[in-house]
A protein has these predicted regions:
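Beta-rich nucleic-acid/ligand-interaction surfaces
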Residues: 99-104
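Short Lys/Arg-rich amphipathic alpha-helical segments
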Residues: 1-91, 108, 112-114, 119-124
Length: 124
């Protein structure tokens, strides 16, 4: 799980995100349908703080990261999100905040789902 935090993120966004991650049915059931959550399959979460997800490339050729949260706030929200996930019964492993890390991931199938707390309150 790659996590980007904005300065607008707080307890409401943390709770919503943790609940979604714990309960999203994104793993296949016995019939091959995405019908099982990470909790259902006994999975774990690798949580990586990734401010570059807020990279804005609409202008120029150098990304702007002004939408990313200030480091102290971002670290606090990221850690609180990980604790909220643990509160849902998940095992959470963490990367190091603000560190240069090599992280490998394998997308299993054509599924990547962004969760954006800025859209959580919009009507469907």
């Amino acid at each position: 799980m790659l996590v980007a935090v904005s300065d607008d993120d707080g307890p409401e966004q943390i709770d919503w995100t943790a609940r979604k991650i714990a309960n999203l049915r994104i793993f296949d059931d016995d019939e091959g349908k995405m019908n099982r959550s990470v909790l259902d399959v006994g999975g774990e979460v690798l949580s990586i703080s990734q401010f570059t997800l807020y990279g804005d490339v609409r202008r120029g050729n150098r990304p702007s990261f002004v939408a990313a949260g200030q480091p102290d706030h971002a670290r606090d929200v990221w850690l609180r999100l990980d604790e909220a996930l643990r509160g849902h019964g998940l095992t959470v492993r963490e990367g190091r905040f603000a560190a240069h890390m090599r992280v490998s991931l394998t997308n299993d199938g054509p599924v990547t789902i962004p969760l954006d707390t800025a859209v959580m309150a919009r009507p469907r």
